[in-house]
């Protein structure tokens, strides 16, 4: 029986690009209101999982469910309805350089609501304030720091009050202080919005700070080889690959706060 607390369920998923299989036999579920980490070394397919969760890529086999709805097999209209309740932060932040921050955040509201221009501006200002960017409405992305760009991207991701947030390497390229502030913000959004948050990352500090549950992907075997609370995996996993990844900072590998 499916876990009634599950918000997102991945069942028997195989991901491939043409004949090249990236990952096979993925099974995991994300409970409502938790921060779920998709982790593993670079190149193991973490971002590919995220792309399949929102339909940018289609799985070779298997299914993705949002609640009781099979997203993988849903018709286009049903998919669109699901995705309107999902906010996404891409690794680059994906802000439009020709738009102000308020215009960037307001874009989904223009596309999917009947709000007036003034109402959209008010909502955009509120979302920017939620991520610590009050007063930056009329700045352009090039005029703010990388950490502020990530926060602006988060503001846009929550513009439609999503039930779920999917974040692709949110701390990539940030200095340790900015990364820590972003982690704090992610937890604040989880608590204030009650959102389910899936984070693709290999940043150890973030993994241990924000992760309620996780899955560990292994590029060599092309599947998930561990799952559970990151702190519990650190304490109890006997798999050498998992332990090497989770202790690499302590062993002198500069992996605690890496770029990319």
Language model segments and positions:
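Catalytic Walker B motif of ABC-type/P-loop ATPase nucleotide-binding domains
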Residues: 165-168
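Conserved ABC ATPase "signature" region
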Residues: 70, 117-136
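A short, proline-enriched helix->beta-strand linker immediately N-terminal to the Walker B motif
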Residues: 159-163
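Conserved ABC transporter NBD signature motif
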Residues: 62-71
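Conserved ABC ATPase signature
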Residues: 140-144, 148
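Helix-to-loop junction immediately C-terminal to a conserved catalytic motif
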Residues: 54
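ABC ATPase NBD coupling module
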Residues: 71-87, 117, 233-237
């Amino acid at each position: 029986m499916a876990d009634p607390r599950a918000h997102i369920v991945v069942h028997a998923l195989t991901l491939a690009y043409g004949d090249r299989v990236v990952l096979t036999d993925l099974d995991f579920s994300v409970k409502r209101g938790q921060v779920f980490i998709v982790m593993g070394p670079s190149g193991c397919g973490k971002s590919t999982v995220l792309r399949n969760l929102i339909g940018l890529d289609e799985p070779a086999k298997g299914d993705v469910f949002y609640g009781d709805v099979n997203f993988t097999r849903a018709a286009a209209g049903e998919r669109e309805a699901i995705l309107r309740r999902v906010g996404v932060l891409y690794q680059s932040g994906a802000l439009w350089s020709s738009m102000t921050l308020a215009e960037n955040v307001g874009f989904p509201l223009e596309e999917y609501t009947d709000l007036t221009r003034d109402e959209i501006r008010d909502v955009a200002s509120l979302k920017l304030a939620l991520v610590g960017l009050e007063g930056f409405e009329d700045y352009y992305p090039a005029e703010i720091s990388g950490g502020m760009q990530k926060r602006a991207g988060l503001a846009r991701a929550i513009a439609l009050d999503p039930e779920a947030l999917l974040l692709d390497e949110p701390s990539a390229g940030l200095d340790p202080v900015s990364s820590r502030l972003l982690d704090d913000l992610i937890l604040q959004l989880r608590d204030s919005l009650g959102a389910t948050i899936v984070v693709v990352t290999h940043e150890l500090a973030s993994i241990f700070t924000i992760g309620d549950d996780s899955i560990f992907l292994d590029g060599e075997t092309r599947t998930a080889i561990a799952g559970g609370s990151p702190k519990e995996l650190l304490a109890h996993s006997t798999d050498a690959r998992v332990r090497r990844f989770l202790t690499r900072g302590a062993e002198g590998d500069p992996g605690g706060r890496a770029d990319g």
